[in-house]
């Protein structure tokens, strides 16, 4: 399983790891977050015999969006989870279309993989029109904040196909939400795996009602933050595509442990410290929204 995209890779890998562990699978993961070609290669070496035979049956690989082009040439992949595409690391990637094209070209090297795409991201979902792979979609059917207005800054304000401005029925965060182009008709699909309502959002968890490919479930996401609801539903899609049963999928989401710096909480004297890693404008904005509600 390969996880790529701008935000959510490391946390998603933690959920996937919990799912494979609970399912009794033999696997390894590049847990240190070394997600360039050198780090991915080192992970395979560390989990292989001296003659090059892998000691495990499966791998969960976090992969940098740009490095995926090279990595995809050397691996067999069952499932690819693309979390989202946002403006990020402009010194490396330039505009968001560069990141999108890098992922798209990488996926084309793995035509037999099932690809899980964020239906709420107009950039990410656009790949479904240009790749031969089987597609599974995930998303959030409702806004996290019913009073939320359109974001002042959007990484995808205009249709990727015809350049007309999108209309939105609702926003979740950034450019994610119920997008639709009134000119060419490109729009958000109804996701295969969808959060239908958000019942509770706390500092350390969220409770959602989710439709997992037709089955409605109440799920407690074992980490706070709106964007981690996306990570959870994306992993539900990826684990199901991998063949993990629904009960184990839900169990993984409800009991996984977060990664270093990802909504990490610890005590400093009598105070609780929240350690939250941010790397780009979209992530920073969501972190500010989270902190103002604590």
Language model regions located:
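A conserved, hydrophobic alpha-helical segment in the catalytic core
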Residues: 74-84, 176-190, 220-254
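Cys/His-rich short segments
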Residues: 140-204, 222
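Active-site beta-alpha connecting loops in nucleotide-dependent enzymes
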Residues: 259, 277-294
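Phosphate-binding loop of NTP-binding sites
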Residues: 1-139, 147-150, 154-158
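Gly/charged, well-structured mid-domain segments that form the phosphate/adenylate-handling core
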Residues: 186, 201-203, 238-278
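Buried hydrophobic packing segments
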Residues: 16, 20, 40-44, 232-242, ...
């Amino acid at each position: 399983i390969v996880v790529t995209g701008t935000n959510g890779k490391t946390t998603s890998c933690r959920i996937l790891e919990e799912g494979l562990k609970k399912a009794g699978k033999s696997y390894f993961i590049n847990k240190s977050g070394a997600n360039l070609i050198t780090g991915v290669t080192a992970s395979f070496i560390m989990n292989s015999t001296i003659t090059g035979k892998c000691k495990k049956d499966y791998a969960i690989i976090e992969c940098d969006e740009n490095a995926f082009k090279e990595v995809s040439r050397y691996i067999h992949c069952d499932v690819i989870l693309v979390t989202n595409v946002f403006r990020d690391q402009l010194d490396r990637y330039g505009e968001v279309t560069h990141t999108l094209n890098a992922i798209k070209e990488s996926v084309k090297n793995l035509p037999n993989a099932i690809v899980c795409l964020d239906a709420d991201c107009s950039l990410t979902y656009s790949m479904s029109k240009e790749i031969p792979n089987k597609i599974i979609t995930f998303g959030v059917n409702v806004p996290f904040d019913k009073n939320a207005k359109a974001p002042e800054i959007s990484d995808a304000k205009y249709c990727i196909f015809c350049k007309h401005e999108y209309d939105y029925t609702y926003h979740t965060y950034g450019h994610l939400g119920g997008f639709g182009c009134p000119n060419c008709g490109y729009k958000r699909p109804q996701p295969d795996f969808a959060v239908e309502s958000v019942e509770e959002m706390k500092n350390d968890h969220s409770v959602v009602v989710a439709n997992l490919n037709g089955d409605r479930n109440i799920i407690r996401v074992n980490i706070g933050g709106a964007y981690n609801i996306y990570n959870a539903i994306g992993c539900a899609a990826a684990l199901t595509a991998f063949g993990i049963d629904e009960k184990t999928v839900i169990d993984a989401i409800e009991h996984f442990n977060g990664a270093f710096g990802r909504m990490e909480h610890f005590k400093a004297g009598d105070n609780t410290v929240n350690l939250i890693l941010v790397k780009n404008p979209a992530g920073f904005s969501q972190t500010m929204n989270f902190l103002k509600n604590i």
